[in-house]
């Protein structure tokens, strides 16, 4: 089986790039259904202040960047990685993403990478940074074969006007710098560092926080500049701005970005750049598949008493390789089952009309989650010619876990107000009727079937498109092999 990408939007990439991202869940939309990541919180300090950020070091009830339940030393982090790698054999990536900035804590960051590289050579290593110190450490990163770096860049305004509204200050060359000057220095360092990374063959993912009224209309210019310097991927992240999080923007009344605002920004920026659309804005101690939070299972007391020798046996690279070979076999047959969708044309619709389809999935690229337990919906745009993934939409509470036993359908209807169709593994009569009353079709006949083919099939089925095909028209051998894995 080839290691080439099973995602149509990635198949045009050079083979060496496809190989780099093939099992990286953040850089490959296809991989995120199958491979897990771990973030270790070894970097508490930060060298800039962002108005959308409030770091918390002992927080278990918030799901956003900058928070962690516990900080780790490099040795503790390496032990955690090895323990988790033995438990979660689909783990493919170690990232350092805070709770501060990885490169504002260089000794801890690179000591962690050294310890892990010596003992878990099969993992990809990556880090996340604001970019202020990036030029200084590019050569150091290459020593550890760190070939994926994420840089948060929210403006390319050379006057510093936009940046001064986002960053009150930076700490650079042993002094605190404020206002427009701070923003201009930060931008210069970000661009310089990203260019150096590109020259070294390091893939750059750029994160941009979508801040309504401040940089929302400017992100198109950010995307153009990123493409110009060779950045691989652009991720538009809606600002999380609830007052209870204690950020300057949240307390100052700057609202969280809406799903619609994110979609509009992605549409505008996607003309220039390849976009990441499956981001979940992970915590600094995230563990598991993207969209899955298993961090609370792996606190220090679980692994800290174990020696490195014990942990190497527990990690068991051979068993991990065997497990990941099975994942690749599953992906191969999933790709075959979705083959007809992979041949989609550039246009999604022959009439320019498309709909939004919501899907419930617990991973693996399959429709396999009950409506009542869903914590997020995957949103696809679909027409008669093809489909494309848009983004995910989180729910604050599951339908079957509402307060006082209530089933909160109203928040779900609000989340899906622009959708026409929901595909789910199972749904009860009451929510199905509620959805129908709001004009939403729900269908559970595609349970345990591939998402992509199901979305296209259901769109054609329900919206009077002539060329309808059902799941039994899929290649029977591939579907049979695929279902053996479930």
Report residues per predicted region:
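C-terminal accessory regions of radical SAM enzymes
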Residues: 257-338
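Non-catalytic interface/targeting segments
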Residues: 328-407, 411-414, 418, 443-486
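Short hydrophobic/aromatic-enriched beta-strand-loop microsegments
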Residues: 147-152, 439-450
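N-terminal [4Fe-4S]-dependent radical SAM core
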Residues: 1-41, 55-69, 83, 87-90, ...
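Conserved AdoMet/S-adenosylmethionine-binding subsite of the radical SAM
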Residues: 103-237, 242
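Mid-chain, well-packed structural core segment of small domains
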Residues: 412-441
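Local cysteine-cluster metal-coordination motifs and their immediate loop/turn environment
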Residues: 2-5, 43-58, 277-289, 433
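Short Fe-S-cluster ligation motifs
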Residues: 76-97, 312-323
